[in-house]
């Protein structure tokens, strides 16, 4: 039989889906604590702008053509570009704009056509304090998920671009960490591009390449991170995949797993595509990687009600409990025996099962253990 799965598609289990929901709730709490507003974004982008933004990378876009207008458009490849496009078309923009998002990006990556992300963008401010804020927000968010052993890896888009002199083969060598190809060009200087160090002296060699501005920005950002207790190091050979970055770039690693869980940087020229001049910085969290390392559980719900009364007292009890803010499910499978109903309820994450018989309710805390009380007595115990 032919499979109904699409190559590159991912299904999420109920446990994974519950974790995604909990991650989103944490994201809302942390991002809004820093003054960020939620922005709901289109799934689509004009393909001509994807070509302008991503260059060769636009070939990874999943594209469509409107049979009526003949316009080509693609599913969004990236949230940053979609945020900038949206902000550039909004009226009454008050700079700086702080926004956060949550959803999927799409590409023809065979490892997965769709990837979940959340993140923040700070539009309209060019200071290093803005870059620091984005890193601080994302770090606090990851910590709120119980991830404590984090390290921020810093670099600057201008470094590799200047050293490679915009040569495509050298940019590719940096991206692929091709040490042989890099050594042919850099000689002994290659050691500065492969060393990961917190020591600010690693930045001194940048003056040799007339990169004093990049050096000062990285030094200033490092001091801010140090002051606020955020662990960091410099990796001057770091390259971000998207070509629109212009300034500080970063990745946030969880050291136990060795995974980069978030990344981003400054992109001061991106809004020019849409006729604006908004300096900006931002970063995204890669939720697929979070799903790999965070514990996944069935969502806990409060009560599962089994109604054995002719007057539907169980249904009425369930409504009363929901009005009190409880999460309540009902047994609707008439043919199922009590034992199987109890097993089902506890397997689905219900904390207690309520078997309602006339004015009496049996409160099960396990498939075997219960107490008996009147319905009114039970309700008096509920907060």
UniProtKB/Swiss-Prot annotation:
Subcellular localization, as worded in the UniProt entry: Cytoplasm
A cellular-component GO term for this protein: cytoplasm
Keywords recorded for this protein, A-Z: Amino-acid biosynthesis, Cytoplasm, Histidine biosynthesis
Source taxon at top rank: Bacteria
Pathway: Amino-acid biosynthesis; L-histidine biosynthesis; L-histidine from 5-phospho-alpha-D-ribose 1-diphosphate: step 1/9
One Pfam family matching this protein: tRNA-synt_His
GO MF annotation: an example: histidine-tRNA ligase activity
InterPro entries associated with the record: aa-tRNA-synth_II/BPL/LPL, HisRS-like_core, HisRS/HisZ, HisZ
GO BP: histidyl-tRNA aminoacylation; L-histidine biosynthetic process
Cross-referenced CDD domains: HisRS-like_core (cd00773)
Role: Required for the first step of histidine biosynthesis. May allow the feedback regulation of ATP phosphoribosyltransferase activity by histidine.
Quaternary structure and interacting proteins, as annotated: Heteromultimer composed of HisG and HisZ subunits.
UniProt family annotation: Belongs to the class-II aminoacyl-tRNA synthetase family. HisZ subfamily.
Note: This function is generally fulfilled by the C-terminal part of HisG, which is missing in some bacteria such as this one.
Name the record gives this protein: ATP phosphoribosyltransferase regulatory subunit
Organism listed in the record: Aquifex aeolicus (strain VF5)
Organism phylogeny: Bacteria, Pseudomonadati, Aquificota, Aquificia, Aquificales
Gene for this chain: hisZ
